[in-house]
Curated annotation (Swiss-Prot):
This is Inner kinetochore subunit fta7. GO terms for biological process: cell division; mitotic sister chromatid segregation. It comes from Schizosaccharomyces pombe (strain 972 / ATCC 24843). The keyword Cytoplasm applies. It is found in: Nucleus; Chromosome, Centromere, Kinetochore; Cytoplasm, Cytoskeleton, Microtubule organizing center, Spindle pole body. Belongs to the CENP-Q/OKP1 family. It comes from the Eukaryota.
């Protein structure tokens, strides 16, 4: 929610007579609000060096702000403002919950990276197995095409040795069945080897989907927490502006 700017003309003699500087407690509350709001920005900095430099720069700015606040005249209160201690405690609770959610998101992101790396390795292994299977199939087909003439030649010789033509047809059928059986057994062997990789890839894919859904839920929760904190701060700012 965007705050609207309000301008009010006040005479100088009225400021000198009725307005008074801020109390020490009020100045401390203003500094605490600045520090609380600054944490949300500083925590987004990933580099520890840049974060420490930003904190040092912000503390210097606060020191420069605190000196003029001591002599800044403000009007007297007309109504009771909201209790700052309650607002501060609720903000601290939301901030702690936000930190725990951020830690949980970091853990989920690390697990997601690990599962993604495992899934990539499984996919590579699966592709290698498929390539090996294709190479072996091509070798089997090549051997089959090369062996058939020799087998036929051998069968012709055996036909000359044996008078019965049924023996020759039986031998040809037997050789063909042996070739088909060896090819089928090889295919079954590689299919059995590929089954564990396929199951593992499916498990990792399901885990990846679950982690992605959990991260989305945590992100929505963080957005709600930030919106709640911003609404609390906006309400306190509006009440202070009304008092002014």
């Amino acid at each position: 929610m965007e705050m609207k700017r309000r301008v009010r003309a006040v005479r100088r003699d009225q400021i000198q007579k009725r307005w008074r500087p801020l109390e020490d407690k009020q100045r401390q509350e203003i500094i605490i609000i600045f520090r609380t709001c600054s944490r949300l920005v500083l925590n987004t900095i990933k580099s520890e060096t840049r974060k420490s430099l930003a904190e040092e720069w912000f503390m210097n700015i606060l020191l420069k702000i605190e000196a003029p606040l001591r002599n800044l005249p403000v009007p007297r209160k007309r109504k009771e403002s909201i209790l700052f201690s309650q607002l501060l405690s609720s903000n601290m609770q939301l901030e702690q919950q936000l930190y725990s959610d951020l830690d949980h998101i970091n853990v989920l992101q690390q697990e997601l990276k690990v599962e993604t790396a495992r899934l990539e390795n499984e996919q590579k292994s699966y592709e290698e197995m498929k390539q090996n299977m294709a190479i072996n199939n091509s070798r089997l087909a090549d051997l089959k095409s090369k062996l058939h003439p020799y087998l036929k030649k051998g069968l012709k010789i055996s036909h000359d040795n044996f008078s019965d033509s049924n023996d020759f047809s039986f031998q040809k059928k037997l050789n063909t069945e042996d070739s088909n059986t060896s090819k089928t057994s090889t295919l079954d062997m590689y299919k059995e080897k590929l089954k564990p990789f396929t199951k593992t890839m499916q498990i990792h894919a399901n885990k990846t989907v679950q982690l992605s859904q959990t991260i989305q839920k945590a992100t929505l929760l963080l957005q709600r927490l930030n919106n709640t904190k911003n609404i609390g701060l906006n309400k306190s700012s509006k009440l202070k502006i009304k008092n002014i």
